[in-house]
Amino acid sequence: MRIGMRLLLGYFLLVAVAAWFVLAIFVKEVKPGVRRATEGTLIDTATLLAELARPDLLSGDPTHGQLAQAFNQLQHRPFRANIGGINKVRNEYHVYMTDAQGKVLFDSANKAVGQDYSRWNDVWLTLRGQYGARSTLQNPADPESSVMYVAAPIMDGSRLIGVLSVGKPNAAMAPVIKRSERRILWASAILLGIALVIGAGMVWWINRSIARLTRYADSVTDNKPVPLPDLGSSELRKLAQALESMRVKLEGKNYIEQYVYALTHELKSPLAAIRGAAEILREGPPPEVVARFTDNILTQNARMQALVETLLRQARLENRQEVVLTAVDVAALFRRVSEARTVQLAEKKITLHVTPTEVNVAAEPALLEQALGNLLDNAIDFTPESGCITLSAEVDQEHVTLKVLDTGSGIPDYALSRIFERFYSLPRANGQKSSGLGLAFVSEVARLFNGEVTLRNVQEGGVLASLRLHRHFT
């Protein structure tokens, strides 16, 4: 396959991947966007009907009031509307009214009268002066059977006397959503075609310039008198001019051939690199392979970025000679670090036991939270699935010792003396390699706080990490 075709294929794949990501975001936003717009309409409708329903509710017999009569007539009234190509042939609103205790007094579907709806989110929140809404599955086995309800209070002056809730099936919005998704897909296909045409033109221009430069380089290698080609690109033109200048300066010397060969070789090396990169994409891998390759790139990029940020943070920390100590609530600290790692704990089904401790410790809050978080991260990494981690604090008259106990395999004897060294890390069960800076950061924080950090194996299995700090300012 020619290099021009490889470049075109590589460009097209890059554009296709980018378009796929953008398209996925657009399509993903269609459904919630339509539902948010519908929710706005529902709250307007509910507010209007709540005003109309007030006399019926005050009369004491809303099932025979004007609102009930209107809905009864509506059910027998045929209508048809064409909304942008979508035919609407029936009313899809479901309306019910409750009293101030949440008991249903009127139901347009005649199914829930007399039932207690005070626990439904729309009624419960509205009765408490808040915005009430909910989305409920009519059929638990059918995820498309959900109905969106929005409620409004029925007021008699400043007194709340009931709630009116308006519901609409989400399935009624499906035609609009599907049509929008189809239009986005068509527009994306057209955009992709335009990008392909533009890419073909760009690749043709680049390929022509590279071919001219290659012919010129070959001629210079053979010591043939050839004019400097017009390459269009300023970078390639400067490169050709440099090559021409070198050829002129070395002309007539015995080693001209050696220099030109070396220069030509250096010129062909980046071309070979471009060719090699294009060959990786020439087979046109399926989207899932492209996605996996992209995910790998993003993962490695994130890892490098995290390493750089950790290095910078470590360097800043090591350059600090003093810190501003404040009273840190240990219970709140435990809560923050544990909540921040809920996902990691859930992924490995690890049980985290947090021992309540009402005590303060003298530290800089951000640094202490990062240090304790590093100890907890380390425990999560080395604790097997369905294991257990205990977060506790031991208090004496002068010190508070924060402890993280896991049920992992422990630290090998050969690593105990090096565990706090920078860039030293042990292999994880998942095969991932850490930066080796987490425990070094904890050690440096302990130094700044005039404290002490230790890690030791426990007899029952696992590792106990202890961060000993002062209770009071020193």
UniProtKB/Swiss-Prot annotation:
State one molecular function term (GO). ATP binding
Catalytic reactions of this protein: ATP + protein L-histidine = ADP + protein N-phospho-L-histidine
Record keywords = ATP-binding, Cell inner membrane, Cell membrane, Kinase, Membrane, Nucleotide-binding, Phosphoprotein, Transferase, Transmembrane, Transmembrane helix, Two-component regulatory system
Q: Which residues carry this modification: Phosphohistidine?
A: 265
Q: Which Pfam families match?
A: HAMP, HATPase_c, HisKA
- List locations, semicolon-separated: Cell inner membrane
Supply the CDD domains for this chain: HATPase_CreC-like (cd16945), HisKA (cd00082)
Q: GO CC annotations?
A: plasma membrane
Q: How does it sit in the membrane?
A: Multi-pass membrane protein
HAMP domain residues: 205-255
Keyword ATP-binding listed? The answer is: yes
The stretch of residues making up the signal peptide is none
Per the UniProt topology annotation, the Periplasmic ranges are 1-6, 168-183
What is the documented function of this protein? Member of the two-component regulatory system CreC/CreB involved in catabolic regulation. CreC may function as a membrane-associated protein kinase that phosphorylates CreB in response to environmental signals. CreC can also phosphorylate PhoB.
**Can you say what this protein is called?**
Sensor protein CreC
Q: Which organism is it from?
A: Escherichia coli (strain K12)
**Source lineage:** Bacteria, Pseudomonadati, Pseudomonadota, Gammaproteobacteria, Enterobacterales
Q: Which gene encodes it?
A: creC
